[in-house]
């Protein structure tokens, strides 16, 4: 009898596990909506977005051009907070909603929300596991790891994170906005590490994409910039 009950329990656990990884259309639709709301305002402020598309975004989101310009990051952060509440609820119920559960590119929705939150340290182990299990592209793991490290004042690994600060131009004496790739640990190996992680571009090419002239800096050099 005990053996019989044990078998039933094992089958029940297996069935529950299988149910957890079954494709979930309703969850996919919810995450697609979350992903859209995460990206739409960032699309608006992207320098490559044309004026017609910007007008479409304003109409779709219900903001006037003046209203959005006055409180751009306040609006974005408010939406980020709403999205984070939703994603944390989803993670609590399903774990990371990866490729098996919601397909691609929906499997990136939770990643974007966490990447834009203040809770990267809490959820990075979950993201790393999802990447290892091929539920999300490992380049996303690398990008989040870089953001986590740089937020802690440490060197990044893959050179995915750029930044900028206002400094005094020594030649002109005027204030300039200086953009740079945040310091990298072992910069001589960065392109090899990027390739292993799945990136198709070099650190130099990635910097150019961000309109940054790539140069190697140490943490001390960046901290002493004025």
Could you tell me what each predicted segment is?
Residues 1-24:
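Bacterial Sec-dependent N-terminal signal peptides
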Residues 5, 76, 178-179:
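A generic structural signal for short
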Residues 134-185, 196-197:
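Short aromatic loop motif centered on NTY/YTY
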Residues 189-226:
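A cross-kingdom marker for long, charged
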Residues 118-120, 182-187:
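Short acidic alpha-helix initiation/capping motifs at coil-to-helix transition points
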Residues 21-159:
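N-terminal helix-rich structural modules
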């Amino acid at each position: 009898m005990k053996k019989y009950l044990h078998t039933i329990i094992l089958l029940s656990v297996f069935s529950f596990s299988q149910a957890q990884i079954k494709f979930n259309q309703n969850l996919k639709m919810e995450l697609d909506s979350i992903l859209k709301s995460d990206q739409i305002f960032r699309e608006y402020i992207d320098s490559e977005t044309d004026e017609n598309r910007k007008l479409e975004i304003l109409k779709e989101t219900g903001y006037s051009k003046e209203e959005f310009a006055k409180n751009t990051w306040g609006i974005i952060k408010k939406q980020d907070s709403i999205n984070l509440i939703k994603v944390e609820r989803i993670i609590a119920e399903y774990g990371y909603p990866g490729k098996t559960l919601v397909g691609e590119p929906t499997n990136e929705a939770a990643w974007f929300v966490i990447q834009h939150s203040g809770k990267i340290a809490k959820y990075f182990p979950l993201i790393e596991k999802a990447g290892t299990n091929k539920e999300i592209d490992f380049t996303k793991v690398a990008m989040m790891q870089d953001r986590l490290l740089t937020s802690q004042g440490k060197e990044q690994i893959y050179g995915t994170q750029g930044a900028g600060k206002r400094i005094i131009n020594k030649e002109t004496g005027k204030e300039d906005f200086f953009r740079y790739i945040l310091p990298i640990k072992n910069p001589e190996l960065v392109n090899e590490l990027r390739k292993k992680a799945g990136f198709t571009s070099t650190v130099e090419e990635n910097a150019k994409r961000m309109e940054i002239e790539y140069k190697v800096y140490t943490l001390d050099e960046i901290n002493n910039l004025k």
